Amino acid sequence: ILTPGEEGSNGAVSRAQEMAAQHPEWCFLYQYANDANPRAHFEGTGPEIWRDCPEITHFVAGLGTSGTLMGVGTFLKQQNPDVKIIAVEPPLGERVEGLRNIEDGYIPPVFENWHGRDVLDRKRVVRPRESIEWTRRLVQECGIFAGISSGASLAGAVKVASEINEGTIVFIVCDGGWKYLSTGAYTADLDEAEANAEKIIYF
């Protein structure tokens, strides 16, 4: 089911809500509001990070459904309130696949229900071109076939690293590259890849 590209993920969410209302017999998982989303990261991802990297000083992740940030961020703050929780988002009006700017008219219920503004210490803005550049570096230098929102998270983490004297930064590789093959993100000229990637929103 396709929704108008210019509506971005907001349009897709709205369409899904309409369909769920029309078909109450359907199961609507609604990851933007489903408490199981942040709960999985609060009970799983967060404890795993803390177990393996208790020296963490900064956690950086993309702001999409906000489930990862809310679950991991809440858990880490409970372990050490000094850990900085940083959201990566695209500039208002620009697209980075899988991410959102919470000023664009839709705030995920997960973000509100988990007191997102209290959990986050700050946000870092990452442009589509930066996202693609760092996605390519993940593939070429690390052998990780990551998606563009993962490249955005890495770009945000690099920005954080440039601003501190020392620390331990953890970021999340949250998607695979197979969803982005048609955009040319891995092979095309960078200008062309950026233009193609901005036309499509993936989930």
Residue ranges and their predicted role:
Residues 33-36, 64-67, 89-94, 103, ...:
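Glycine-rich beta-alpha junction loops
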Residues 63-73, 149-157, 180:
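Short glycine/serine/threonine-rich phosphate/pyrophosphate-binding segments
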